[in-house]
């Protein structure tokens, strides 16, 4: 077994008291393994524990945070006549869902489709009948495997014949085994007691995984096999692992997954760790938990690492294309002071000092240099939140002194609170270009700063109780509700797994899984954008929305004031295609009115 590469991230300097130490470590983990759909609710809940850190807004009740998780269904209608099961009564018939909000903010902007502004849904409307399929039957040209997902793969006819039996570790003639590591940490009890309902229930999440797996077993062509999920109690401390500690525990758990016959592992992303994922690869077990890692990391562990979230490299591309195509060489018209709005933009970059963010920050700088943009200032900060106020003050003072008009904040979910407070204190009101940690997180940041913020990786967020993941659960378990509030993560993770299993064909191996994924055509447009793979693509999202923060808009997530609203009429932009940011060298169509 190959030695896991220890993460270079240093442990946080914990203040006195085990509760503060645990909270700071867990918040650092959320920052490292950021997934906006999950992290924002957890971060806001866990900030309750940081009473020793000055200036942090108290989180709302945990029960309210559950509604803030962003697990929303895009509006659209599904045809019940095209839904078919493959021998299971669980399948049910697809219902009809009334059209909901277009996802716009106070100015009525609708989310769109690539190259087309104002498209009112996110691509989940029923496809034409000629392109729908009945799972497991004969396939017509252009048919999809099923009609209930915009991400449905091409139809595969029902398989009859010899599937080759045990074609790979974790595969038999009748089963494909996935494992799930139940998290273990000496500090888990503290995390659970403070976070309350906002902390994911591992057993509830596993239950939802099992529900989706049972349904997908009837919908995808698995060539005589079916997926089984085996859970085991982890030995390693997942919080310590992501700080470069207890690496032997991660190795032991990867060995356990292998001994259980794992072909792949579907551990929840926040209770996985980079060392565990790397050790799974050393055991030749696929992992579906990585989050925010650069493309180079996925390449180095191919074909074993997969994720439903965009790579850090794709996020860097979004920063570069936004700056180079729509901001550089023009006045900082979205800044908060009149004097700054008349100045040509000068950019400053902020990133945490852990290796993953530093690597992504380097990719941003390289891309900017390619289009002739030099940073006026670049700063890193630690994830020691006990020093957050001091570091925020220092960073904003440096940016202000160097005339930075536009802050590129490739930041974790917490530090923008402190940066904004420090900027206010110094009467410094720049433009902000930031990741999107969803509306509830944005509501925690001073609106005098965030009302000048642009997000480079947005998603449409229709009203709660809607979305493809919820609809699929209704089909999987009629009359029941998902057990875990983060069920959408379970849904899209299992969807990715099953797409690869079907595309691999009967001779299932890690290599054929990767080859099958590479062969899949691009999907339609859904809540997570358009999915596409191709060679050396291990994360499917290809596009995103540019958004602006409207402090007056009502959020679809928590019904409070403050929400992200689409720029440019809701046009989707493609990470790798700078031309999709058109009209180039013109100000973004953000705010009301722009400029």
Regions found by a protein language model. Give the residues of each.
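Extracellular/periplasmic ligand-binding modules, especially the Venus flytrap/periplasmic-binding
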Residues: 412-418, 460-521
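Beta-alpha junction/loop-to-helix N-cap segments that form part of ligand/metal-binding clefts
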Residues: 204, 219-301, 381-389, 417
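Signal peptide-proximal N-terminal region
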Residues: 185-191, 199-230, 370-373
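C-terminal region of N-terminal signal peptides and the immediate post-cleavage residues
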Residues: 45-73
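Solvent-exposed, acidic/polar segments of extracytosolic/periplasmic ligand-binding ectodomains
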Residues: 140-145, 150-165, 521-595
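N-terminal export and membrane-targeting signals
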Residues: 15-45
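Extracellular/periplasmic periplasmic-binding protein-like sensory domains
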Residues: 309, 422-492, 587-591
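Extracytoplasmic ligand/sensor domains, especially the bilobed periplasmic-binding protein
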Residues: 137, 259-378, 431-456, 461
């Amino acid at each position: 077994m190959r030695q896991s590469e220890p993460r270079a991230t240093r442990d946080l300097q914990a203040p006195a008291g085990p509760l503060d130490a645990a909270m700071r470590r867990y918040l650092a983990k959320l920052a490292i393994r950021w997934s906006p759909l999950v992290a924002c609710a957890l971060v806001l809940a866990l900030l309750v524990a940081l009473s020793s850190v000055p200036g942090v807004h108290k989180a709302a009740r945990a029960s309210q945070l559950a509604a803030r998780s962003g697990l929303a269904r895009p509006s659209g209608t599904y045809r019940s006549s095209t839904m078919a099961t493959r021998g299971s009564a669980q399948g049910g018939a697809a219902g009809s869902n009334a059209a909901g909000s277009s996802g716009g903010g106070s100015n009525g902007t609708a989310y769109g489709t690539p190259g087309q502004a104002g498209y009112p849904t996110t691509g989940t409307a029923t496809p034409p009948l000629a392109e729908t399929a009945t799972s497991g039957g004969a396939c017509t040209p252009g048919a999809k495997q099923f009609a209930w997902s915009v991400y449905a793969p091409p139809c595969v006819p029902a398989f009859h014949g010899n599937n080759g039996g045990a074609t790979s570790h974790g595969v038999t003639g009748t089963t494909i085994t996935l494992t799930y590591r139940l998290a273990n940490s000496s500090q888990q009890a503290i995390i659970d007691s403070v976070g309350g309902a906002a902390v994911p229930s591992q057993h509830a999440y596993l239950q939802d995984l099992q529900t989706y797996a049972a349904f997908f077993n009837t919908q995808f062509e698995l060539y005589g096999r079916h997926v089984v999920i085996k859970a085991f109690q982890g030995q390693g401390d997942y919080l310590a692992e992501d700080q470069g500690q207890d690496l032997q525990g991660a190795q032991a758990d990867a060995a356990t997954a292998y001994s259980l016959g794992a072909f792949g592992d579907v551990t929840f992303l926040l209770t996985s760790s980079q060392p565990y994922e790397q050790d799974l690869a050393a055991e030749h077990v696929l992992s579906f938990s990585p989050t925010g890692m650069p493309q180079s990391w996925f390449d180095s562990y191919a074909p074993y690492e997969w994720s439903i979230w965009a790579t850090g490299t794709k996020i860097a591309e979004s920063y570069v294309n936004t700056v180079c195509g729509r901001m550089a060489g023009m006045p900082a018209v979205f800044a908060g002071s009149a004097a700054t709005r008349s100045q040509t933009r000068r950019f400053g970059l902020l990133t945490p000092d852990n290796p993953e963010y530093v690597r992504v920050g380097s990719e941003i700088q390289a891309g900017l240099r390619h289009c002739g943009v030099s940073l006026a200032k670049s700063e890193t900060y630690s994830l020691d939140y006990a020093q957050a106020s001091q570091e925020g003050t220092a960073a904003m003072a440096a940016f202000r002194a160097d005339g930075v008009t536009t802050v590129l904040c490739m930041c974790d979910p917490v530090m923008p609170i402190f940066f904004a407070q420090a900027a206010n204190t110094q009467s410094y009101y720049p433009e902000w270009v930031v990741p999107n940690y969803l509306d509830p997180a944005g509501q925690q940041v001073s609106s005098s700063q965030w009302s000048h913020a642009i997000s480079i990786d947005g998603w449409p967020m229709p009203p709660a109780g809607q979305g493809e993941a919820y609809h699929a659960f209704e089909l999987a378990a009629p009359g029941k509700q998902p057990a875990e509030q983060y069920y959408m993560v379970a849904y899209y993770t299992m969807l990715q797994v099953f797409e690869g299993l079907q595309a691999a064909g009967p001779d299932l191996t890690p290599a054929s899984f990767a080859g099958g994924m590479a062969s899949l055509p691009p999907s339609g447009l859904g809540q997570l954008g358009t999915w596409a793979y191709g060679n050396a693509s291990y994360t499917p999202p290809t596009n995103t929305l540019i958004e602006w923060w409207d402090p007056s808009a009502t959020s679809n997530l928590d019904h409070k004031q403050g929400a992200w609203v689409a720029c440019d009429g809701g046009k989707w932009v493609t990470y790798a295609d700078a031309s999709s940011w058109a009209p180039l060298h013109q100000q973004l169509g953000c705010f009301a009115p722009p400029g």
